């Protein structure tokens, strides 16, 4: 499946949901916000949101600092 992730074309072999994508990237699902095809996806829906060929995904990872 081909998607665009943060502006870069990617080919996915295994990730089928947003949760699986986040895990495959080594990110903490509690510390990211995801936009799919210009729509913000609620964190509670990551596991139920299936990826589709051609999806445009933007992931923002929150980090602490001061």
Predicted segments, located by residue:
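Eukaryote-biased recognition of intrinsically disordered, low-complexity regulatory segments
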Residues: 1-7
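Short alpha-helix capping/helix-loop boundary micro-motifs
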Residues: 41-46
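Short, contiguous acidic and Ser/Thr-rich linear segments
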Residues: 7-16
């Amino acid at each position: 499946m081909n998607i665009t992730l943060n502006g870069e074309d990617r080919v996915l072999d295994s990730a089928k949901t947003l949760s699986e994508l986040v895990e495959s990237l080594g990110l903490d699902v509690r510390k990211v916000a995801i936009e799919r095809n210009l729509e913000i996806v609620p964190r509670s829906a990551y596991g139920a949101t299936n990826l589709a060929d051609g999806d445009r995904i933007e992931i923002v990872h929150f980090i602490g600092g001061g």
